[in-house]
Amino acid sequence: MNIQEMILTLQNHWSEHNCILMQAYDTEKGAGTMSPMTLLRSLGPEPWNVAYVEPSRRPDDGRYGENPNRLYQHHQFQVIMKPSPDNIQELYLESLKKLGINPLEHDIRFVEDNWENPTLGAAGLGWEVWLDGMEITQFTYFQQIGGLEANPVTVELTYGIERLASYIQDKENVFDLEWNNGVTIRDIFYQPEYEHSTYTFKESNTDMLFDLFSMYEQEAKQTMEKGLVFPAYDYVLKCSHTFNLLDAKGVISVTERTGYIARIRNLARSISKIYVSEREKLGFPMLQEKGAK
């Protein structure tokens, strides 16, 4: 099964279980959790079920396309269900079966790994899902998002597409994975992988990036003051990616790093509060729609 078939299989599976199929969010981010389709929509009482593929940029993991297992950009298949269904583990195992992985024939373990994202003020109870000794999914019940209590509890499933494909296709080098009809990850992503690594570690203008961080931070604050949640959150994502570029280049000290993370977290918390307040003013419309049904 190639990657394109894997994605279609997961989309069909979760669509059958009432998930909206969304597209990737069009701003750089380090994880699918950072999409507003997860971070903001997990807040408040309104129900929300969604699934989407998210390209995730981790500048510090860039290796010029030379490492068989580490990538500047990898792909996650993200599933969010709020409130969490009682049979979520069964639904997940069923999705593996549809990918050709029979749980009765493999060693599938849920290894406790409580999750935290300090930058977003987010945390939860969670497990890594290991398939025959390799992590393929992160399974998390959100307890806190944007510094706010998650109520009702949202469950997040994050499949590592490349890791899962490495197992299914029995490949040791991620660049040998087939995306579709003989086209490999190397064909599609090797050049951007090499060039983004070169930019991150050698060519980025650090003075400009420091200035951009401050500009994005200020714009996020000003936009929040206008009550414009989603544009403000876009600038928080830009702050996060800019910080990741600076951090990967090693130009931020340990002390400064803590301060930058706190600045991003404070923005995320403020936006989260405004988002819930704005939805409350609207009468939590998706909650009303569910009640009407």
Swiss-Prot record:
GO terms for cellular component: cytosol. The keyword Iron-sulfur does not apply. Its EC number is 6.1.1.14. SUPFAM superfamilies: Class II aaRS and biotin synthetases. GO terms for molecular function: ATP binding; catalytic activity, acting on a protein; glycine-tRNA ligase activity; transferase activity. Keywords: Aminoacyl-tRNA synthetase, ATP-binding, Cytoplasm, Ligase, Nucleotide-binding, Protein biosynthesis. The keyword NAD does not apply. GO terms for biological process: glycyl-tRNA aminoacylation. It comes from the Bacteria. It catalyses: tRNA(Gly) + glycine + ATP = glycyl-tRNA(Gly) + AMP + diphosphate. It is found in: Cytoplasm. HAMAP family: Gly_tRNA_synth_alpha. Tetramer of two alpha and two beta subunits. Belongs to the class-II aminoacyl-tRNA synthetase family. This is Glycine--tRNA ligase alpha subunit. It comes from Oceanobacillus iheyensis (strain DSM 14371 / CIP 107618 / JCM 11309 / KCTC 3954 / HTE831). The gene is glyQ.
